[in-house]
Each structure stands twice: as structure tokens, then as C-alpha cells.
């Protein structure tokens, strides 16, 4: 077992709810770190490690897949707001609705997503530098949880989260000015924010510079997420959120746009030879980063 895998295993065990810090502290009080390291190093490598992680994290037997509330939670990457053609700032009204829906995470595997507007990622918001944004967040009456929104493009406490806390059936509105051009993430920051993000509550906001971006032939909008499910990767049935795996940063799934097959089977990225393509890419997380690239192509320009 290499040091990296050992560290990941120790971190996973230390974070378990049910074993907890108290139990972990008790274990440390009777067994030295050297003893623990020696014992782990003598294990039969992969099988022993996998079994310990599985036992400690409580990998579950799945219930049957549930009926879905929406045909597809994955957002079509071609669903991008049109480029801004005006040259003067204006007031822009934006409304998003927090919706909790059951949909497929993979073929034959359902999951209870928390979303903005019923998709993962949430819709891309597109404004211009200098615009005044009147933003409204609606929490659908069918929701079970409270939600809010944190725009990383907002200069202010929590990116708006402090003034957009909404219980099911409630609405909140706040106004802010887009001061800096760039591509930014937005996400739910309702406590605990990690849980809300891990359920799919993230998206992107693009603040175009005055005068707009250079024209292109096609645009795509893609966000990566990591999913912490009680069952193993590939198990069919209804997956539920595992707080233990999230704390240990051990995701079972990584997706682009909320579904295992979002950019292949569901919405393959298509362009013609010679076209100029712009990709808006972000990482929802909550824990893992990305080195996004396209096999067979080299980006002409990367900017944020």
C-alpha cells in the first residue's frame, strides 16, 4: 500500500459518523500511530484496503430504482444563453427555482437530486460587466429543505446567501451589480453547504466584458461534479447520499452535467470541422478538481 492510499484510508476511517472522533481518539489512546501504520502496511494490499473502507463506510445494499420526477436531470451542454450584443449596461432580471427531484444518475440508477431549475448544473446566467442584476430565488413548495444561493461573482456577504435563505414555498430577491468580468460558480450555501452542493446545487454565471466576447460558431456549458453514494459505482437501484464518503472525500461517481452519460449517450458535443467553439467549464465539486481537456484538440485560448 503506498503512502497516498494509506493516508486516504486513515482519513476515511477518521471521518466516519458512528465511529466518530471520540472512538477514533480512544483507538489512538491505546494504539500508537506507528503500530497502526505497521499493521496497515502488512495487510494484503488492495483487497484488505477495499474491505476496510467498505465496512467502515457502510456501503449499502440498494433499494430498487425509484420513479423519476423528471425525464432527465442532465443539462444539455448546448443550452447556453445567447451572447450579449448590447454595448451599455442595463438591469437584468434573473429567477431560479430550487427543486428537489428524483432522476437518473446513471442508467438504471436513481438519485434524489437537489437542483436549480431541475437540472444539473443549474442554468447558466449571462450578464455584462456593469449590469444591475435583480435576482429572485424561489424554493419550490414540494421541497423538503431550505435553500439559498451564493454567487461567486457578487461582492458581498456570502455572495447573496445571507439574504436568500428560503424555506419551501418561500421567495427571496436581492439586487447586485456585476463589477468584474469572468466566469464564476454559483451554488447553494445553506448549511451544511457541502451537502447541498453534493446533491447537485451548483451552476455558472458568466459576466461578459463591456463590448462582449469574440464571436464563435458554437458554445457549450459543462460542469463537473463528484457524487458520494451509499452504494458502489455501477450498482443499479436507488442511490442515497453518504455523508461519511463525502467527509472522507471518496466519491463513487464523477459526472459532467449530472449524469454518467451526459456528454456521450445523452448530449454528445458536436461541431463541424473548421468551426470555432467556446466551452464554459466549471467545477461544482464539492471536493474534487478537474483537468478538463478534449482528446484530439488543443485549446487556442484559456481564460477565466
Would you name each region that the model predicts?
Residues 2-304:
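Copper-binding active sites and cupredoxin-like electron-transfer domains
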Amino acid at each position: 500500500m503506498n503512502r497516498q492510499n494509506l493516508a486516504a484510508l486513515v482519513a476515511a476511517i477518521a471521518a466516519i459518523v458512528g465511529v466518530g472522533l471520540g472512538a477514533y481518539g480512544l483507538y489512538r489512546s491505546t494504539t500508537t500511530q506507528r503500530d497502526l501504520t505497521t499493521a496497515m502496511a502488512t495487510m494484503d494490499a488492495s483487497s484488505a484496503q477495499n474491505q476496510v473502507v467498505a465496512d467502515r463506510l457502510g456501503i449499502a445494499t440498494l433499494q430498487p430504482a425509484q420513479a423519476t420526477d423528471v425525464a432527465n436531470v442532465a443539462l444539455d451542454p448546448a443550452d447556453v444563453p445567447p451572447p450579449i450584443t448590447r454595448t451599455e449596461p442595463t438591469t437584468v432580471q434573473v429567477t431560479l427555482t430550487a427543486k428537489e427531484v428524483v432522476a437518473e444518475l446513471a442508467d438504471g440508477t436513481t438519485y434524489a437530486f437537489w437542483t436549480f431549475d431541475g437540472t444539473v448544473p443549474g442554468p447558466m446566467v449571462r450578464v455584462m460587466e456593469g449590469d444591475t442584476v435583480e435576482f429572485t430565488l424561489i424554493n419550490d413548495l414540494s421541497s423538503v429543505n431550505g435553500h439559498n444561493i451564493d454567487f461567486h461573482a457578487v461582492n458581498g456577504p456570502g455572495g447573496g446567501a445571507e439574504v436568500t435563505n428560503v424555506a419551501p414555498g418561500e421567495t427571496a430577491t436581492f439586487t447586485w451589480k456585476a463589477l468584474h468580468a469572468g466566469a464564476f460558480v454559483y451554488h447553494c450555501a445553506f448549511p451544511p453547504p457541502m451537502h447541498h452542493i453534493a446533491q447537485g446545487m451548483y451552476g455558472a454565471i458568466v459576466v461578459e466584458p463591456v463590448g462582449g466576447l469574440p464571436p464563435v460558431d458554437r458554445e457549450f456549458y459543462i460542469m463537473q461534479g463528484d457524487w458520494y453514494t451509499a452504494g458502489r459505482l455501477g450498482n443499479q437501484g436507488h442511490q442515497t447520499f453518504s455523508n461519511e464518503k463525502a467527509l472522507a472525500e471518496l466519491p463513487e461517481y464523477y459526472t459532467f452535467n449530472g449524469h454518467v452519460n451526459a456528454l456521450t449517450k445523452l448530449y454528445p458535443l458536436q461541431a463541424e470541422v473548421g468551426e470555432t467553439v467556446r466551452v464554459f467549464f466549471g467545477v461544482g465539486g464539492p471536493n474534487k478538481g478537474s483537468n478538463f481537456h478534449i482528446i484530439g484538440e488543443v485549446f487556442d485560448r484559456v481564460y477565466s
